[in-house]
């Protein structure tokens, strides 16, 4: 179970539950200036258990107001992941007096049999309270395990609602006029999935390319745990087109494309009803999330990130950048080697050719980022408390695979990089966000020094909340 750490590891600007467990972000929706975050939640313990939907709201994605649990388990199952439809035109017929229903589309998971089916619930009071639809499930299980995590969206091509969900090792697409009656329209993934494992937490988004001829592409996002060979929990993405019925991959690659080369970004999805794709991910690796030393709570979310596409020599690749934190960055100033730290929430702006950056404390603990002309490496092998690895089945992963990670750079030569550190969570955005890493660390004492060497110019800014 989650252990009481040697100190408080709760971040300052990343979402965490008030107490107990959270994992996947769910039902992300932006309505009338309010960002709604629903999330997988066990309100009774700091470890994974019967899933509910927790709920929080924000005006800036940094400051959050916690609200009561939104969805509770029922006779069909516990409340697994899903998404939210803002039914402005009342296609569902749930509105009674002119309201605009918020309709949660989620997976009900039977804890005894493992059966997973898709259900809906609606709210007429801005997402505070939900009524389960009497006709649930709206998509019955077709006889397959791992049938979950629907992502609903309005389909302009067909003038209907569509959703994508994970079904074993592939994605399936469904369409509906009223959010109640669904028809399967297509599949994607059989034969193209380069990682042989179960898919989950699918998302389908339309993203600008920056190319006046292409305009935009569609990106299919898929989370997956693949123990054994690499022992990682990653988020793969595919670049392609959506014809209104199904997805086709147009960027054929020899290797999988990953959203993040770190260890602690999983089940990430984007906000609905917003004019740009804004992403949140679960900021802990599911392989060891039950054992991290955070005490009264377990789990956090990444910083919000805006997604876009960049055309590289190898084709279109996803870029991510922090979203909504500009006003919380204090002025940046140059720093030299061995710069003392006066805060546990800060950012580093890095330019140069090659070198090494380390965050260190007086106990000899450090987390290291190393940059070369063609790669970036993050190393947390000496970052602090690593005892949470001891509780995980070694058959699932090799410890060394979750301590050091290297990615190639899509833009060789001088690097531009932003590093954001928040008490126990490190985020790296390099080359405009073409290479991104998310890493949990649990130092026994706060990091006190930034150490640099090599051909790098580093500026530091503090983060005010």
Say what each PLM segment does.
Residues 1-150, 154-199, 208-261, 283-333, ...:
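Beta-rich carbohydrate-recognition and catalytic domains
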Residues 211-214, 239-465:
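Beta-rich accessory regions
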